[in-house]
Each structure stands twice: as structure tokens, then as C-alpha cells.
């Protein structure tokens, strides 16, 4: 009886292990099939970081800082005034430039008035010469007849020569003044144009005492302080556009065989965890490894060289809508997974092959409309250049 029970136990145990083996086989087979169909073409790296533009804010003119409107982490819009400089010196310089323009216009305007004056003098000298010539021609036969003395004729001849010289002098003076004017309008005279440009430059210098944000974003790296004297080109702070961000994923060179531009990428951040998945696209593959572009690149010609698998940065775009819902910060750690399974991989470019016709980034906030000062310059010229 005990022998029968023992045999039953061994039989049940064999059935259990057989069933377990079948279950494990099915599980491993399913896992392998899933890996073969879905995960085999996935490459992943946790050596990935958020990258973005940190637009530097610098002064274009020198001056003392009177106002700092924002501090780090503040949100600003494109065109907002970030820093203001003292306007006293710039205002004085602009007023001087306007006064100088008015004086130059008045001085140049005299050339046009002198043109009329010289023209009248030429006409008068020509009349005098014509009268002297006629007088001399009348007296020549009279002198031959002895009606008048030779002395009187010589005096008439001297008058003719003198009037001829006066006419030539008047013509030369007229031509010299005409050469200065050269039939050019007053507002196009070189000295007037130069003074007008100086006025415009002074006006621009005054406008640039208000330093504006070129983009919409967040303040970072603020270093400027009220009372500080800044110079052109000095860095004051940076503005980070929240929507101009992407991921640089550093993949091993052995992983890049089937990576192509346009492939989909799933990205997980350490900030939000696995519950938030960002969806991106491969937009570019760097033309060198990170080590190749370092400040001190490796010298592999040395005798103690050790081969190390290199990593190549792959640029991955981010969905702007997802960025708005879950904002990221520059430098955050990410995990990027590229789906390299694509039947048209042969038609997908490994490197960019087209030239982009549109600029990558633009800002209208830094373009200053000069129409107000141009109108004012035109008024100064017209008011001081009345003929």
C-alpha cells in the first residue's frame, strides 16, 4: 500500500514538473517572439540630455544700469524690456546731432542761394562787357577820323578788357559754386547725408538703452546689477525659450547601423518618470563623436592606446504640445529609445541631404523701426533748408 502511494506521488511530481516545463517553454518562446518582433529593432540609451537655446542678452551701448526688470526663472515675452540704462548721455548726444544737422543744412542751403547770386552776377558782368564792347567798336572809327583822341580810345579799350576779365571771373565763380551743388537735391548733399546718418545713429543709441528680450522664454544666468556700468557686448543674462528644446542622445557607434533621420523615438525623463513618454523624431546625426570635438581630443597614436567604444550624438526633436504639457529644463537626464524597424530604411537618409531655405531662428524684437527718426530728419531738413 505504501509502495502504491509513493508511486502516485512520484507520478504527480513528474506531471507537475512536465507541466511547469511546458509553461516555461511557452513563456520563454513568447518572450523571445515578442523580442524578435518588437524589441529586436529597438536601440536605447540613458546617456541622453535635454538641450536647448540659451539666447545671450548683452548690451549694445555703454551706460549705467538704472533698471533690472526681471530675475532668474521669470517668464518674459518677446520684446519685453529686460534692462534699462541711463538715458542722459544718449539724449544729449541725440540733441547735439539734431542741432548739427540743422546747421549743416543751413550752410549747405547757402550754396543754392549763392548759385542764384552768382548767376545774377554773371548776367550783370555780361551786360557790362557787351556795353564796353559796343562802346569800343563805336569809338574805333571815330579815332581814325580824329574826332576823339587816341587816349580816349585806349581808355575805352582798357574798360573793355576790364569788363571781359570781370565776366570771366563771374563765370568761374558760378561754375565753382555749381560744382559744389552739382544739381543734387539738398537732402542728398554728402555733408547733409553724413549729418543725417549721425543723427540716426544717436537715435538708435538712445533706443538701445532699453535692452529687450529677443524671444519668449525664461530668464537664466542673470549677472547684471543695478548701478553697474556695462559696455557693448557684455553678457547680462540669458533667455531660454521653453519650446526650443530637443534631446541629444549619445548612442554607441555599434548601435547606429540602422539609425536614420525621421525614425520615431520614445523618450522618458528622470523628472517625470515612466508615466510620461515624450514622442520625438530623429532629426540629425552628429558628424563626429563627442570625443572628437572636445577641447583636448584623444591622441590615439600613443603606445598605450586602449580601444573604447565611441558615442555619437543623435539629435531628437520633441513634440511642442508635449513640451507645453510637461515642461523640460536644459540638462535634464533622459532615456531615448529609437525604433529602427522600417521597411523603407533604404530610402531614409542617414545624413541630411537638402539645404533648408528657411532660417532656423529669427527675432523681430531686435529690429528697430527707424521710420520715426527718418521723418524727424526730413522735417529738420525741410525747415532749415527753405530756399
From Swiss-Prot:
Reported induction: Growth phase-dependent transcription is induced by tetracycline. Expression may be controlled by both RpoS and the Mar system.
Keyword Protein biosynthesis: no
GO terms, molecular function: bile acid transmembrane transporter activity; xenobiotic transmembrane transporter activity
Pfam families (alphabetical): CusB_dom_1, HlyD_D23
SUPFAM superfamilies, per database record: HlyD-like secretion proteins (SSF111369)
Annotated keywords: Cell inner membrane, Cell membrane, Membrane, Transmembrane, Transmembrane helix, Transport
Consequence of gene loss (knockout): Mutants are more sensitive to nalidixic acid, mitomycin C and other stresses such as hydrogen peroxide or UV irradiation.
Residues spanning the membrane: 17-37
GO cellular-component term (any): periplasmic side of plasma membrane
Membrane topology note: Single-pass membrane protein
Gene3D superfamilies reported for this sequence: 2.40.30.170, 2.40.50.100, Helix hairpin bin (1.10.287.470)
UniProt-annotated location(s): Cell inner membrane
Cytoplasmic side of membrane: 1-16
GO BP terms in the entry: bile acid and bile salt transport; DNA damage response; response to antibiotic; xenobiotic detoxification by transmembrane export across the cell outer membrane; xenobiotic detoxification by transmembrane export across the plasma membrane
All ranges on the Periplasmic side of the membrane: 38-387
Subunit description: Part of the tripartite efflux system EmrYK-TolC, which is composed of an inner membrane transporter, EmrY, a membrane fusion protein, EmrK, and an outer membrane component, TolC. The complex forms a large protein conduit and can translocate molecules across both the inner and outer membranes.
Function comment: Part of the tripartite efflux system EmrYK-TolC, which confers resistance to various drugs.
Family recorded in the similarity comment: Belongs to the membrane fusion protein (MFP) (TC 8.A.1) family.
Protein name as annotated: Probable multidrug resistance protein EmrK
Primary gene name: emrK
